[in-house]
Amino acid sequence: MRPSHAHSYADLLSILQVSSSHTTVPKEEIYDLLGIGYGPAHLALSIALRESTEANEANFKSHFLEKRGHFAWHPALLLPGSQLQVSPLKDLVTLRDPTSTYSFYNYLHSHGRLARYINKEQGVPSRREWTSYLAWAARRMNDAVSYGQDVVSIEPLTLASAAPDAKQDVL
């Protein structure tokens, strides 16, 4: 576990000061990782961090800011009959951890639709079903994201402002 006051060069590159147009987010919160936007890639990253023993033991602090008021994935492309263009095995977690509770198949199981999905002739979900899966996973990660946050600036912190009592020769 790294000491909370020690910052490596890589840490300093990822420590950011965020100013938001909303006052619901602290103006000067410090994170090890701050994600701007909360689409499928950042959703998958936030899940991976939550499930990471190493990140949890190191008290790795991450958060994500999303401009929209809720999770959405290409809402304009939810056309009737449209199908996902990739394998559902490329969901948010399966390639990293097939036993994760955030998998597409766990989503189907928890909604009582796994058997029906497996028995379908076509093993590719509709875009509507995939969107529902992503939203389900995002709701389970609500504490990792602040919605309705319009980020207006990002400024790197200096070593002195990130850890005033740290030695300047850390870099």
Model-based region annotation:
Residues 40-41, 69-71, 152:
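Short, solvent-exposed loop/turn segments at secondary-structure junctions
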Residues 66-71, 134, 142, 159:
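Rossmann-like flavin
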Residues 147-170:
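A conserved short coil-to-beta-strand element within the FAD-binding core of flavoproteins
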